[in-house]
Regions:
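Intrinsically disordered or highly flexible coil/loop and linker segments, enriched in small
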Residues: 28, 50, 191-195
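Extended, charge-rich low-complexity regions and/or helical-solenoid scaffolds
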Residues: 40-123, 128-129
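An acidic- and aromatic-residue-enriched active-site/binding cleft used to recognize and process polar
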Residues: 66-68, 132, 154-158
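Hydrophobic alpha-helical scaffolding
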Residues: 12, 53, 136, 168, ...
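C-terminal subregion of chymotrypsin/trypsin-like serine protease catalytic domains
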Residues: 146-204
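Short, small-residue-biased leader/transition segments that mark boundaries at the very start
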Residues: 2-3, 7-9
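Catalytic nucleophile loop of clan PA
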Residues: 132-153
Length: 204
């Protein structure tokens, strides 16, 4: 009786047939697709031996390279290579509820309390690079030339959404959250310095 009154029961009842019937059928179908995909790819090599054939990198380790740089995708428009906490506060000041901030964030910004994570008098939040990324790269580490963590990739610019099919190094940019901002949120904003103390921070 208690279970029948649970709010989640209708959802469970709805998804049970899906799990028991649709999921197994989908897995069978996907196995068949994978089998014939191998035949298709082999056929392409035979029919078009001089063409470039791109590998399927899904579920594999990938590496890409690029530079930290902005872009000018259209005439009269230019994106700088980084954003700062100033921009977050500027969006908050528009009154749009999507950009709501807690008072502590505003206080730390007003005091420019950026700790050791500032670059000059700014706290970088995100930066862009000319790395060729794709769907599924969110969370991928972005490393400098020495292998030190610079940030975490999480998106592409709007003008880069076609890069799975055509990569334009002058237009396509991946978007990365700066690891210094992540550390600042942990250490200064959230007061979790004990977590940062467990890490080895590399400083130039």
């Amino acid at each position: 009786d208690t279970l029948s009154l649970h709010d989640a029961l209708p959802i469970y009842t709805f998804f049970t047939p899906f799990r028991n019937e649709i999921v197994p059928a989908y897995k069978t179908f996907q196995t068949e697709v994978n089998k014939w995909m191998q035949v298709y790819v082999e056929g392409k090599y035979v029919m078009f031996p001089l063409e470039k054939h791109w590998p399927d990198a899904n579920s594999t380790l990938r590496i890409t390279y690029g530079q930290l740089e902005g872009s000018a995708p259209t005439d009269g428009m230019r994106y700088t290579e980084h954003t700062t906490l100033d921009g977050i506060v500027a969006k908050y000041n528009t009154g749009n509820p999507d950009f709501e901030l807690l008072p502590r964030m505003l206080d730390l910004h007003a005091a420019k309390n950026y700790g050791p994570y500032a670059q000059g008098d700014e706290l970088w939040v995100c930066f862009t690079g000319s790395n060729h990324t794709t769907g599924g790269n969110s969370g991928s580490p972005v490393l400098d030339e020495n292998g030190y963590l610079m940030g975490l990739n999480f998106d592409r610019s709007w003008e880069s959404t076609m890069s799975d099919y055509l990569f334009d190094p002058n237009r396509c940019r991946n978007i990365v959250v700066d690891i210094r901002y992540v550390l600042w949120v942990m250490d200064i904003y959230s007061g979790a310095k004990h977590l940062v103390d467990e890490m080895t921070l590399m400083k130039e």
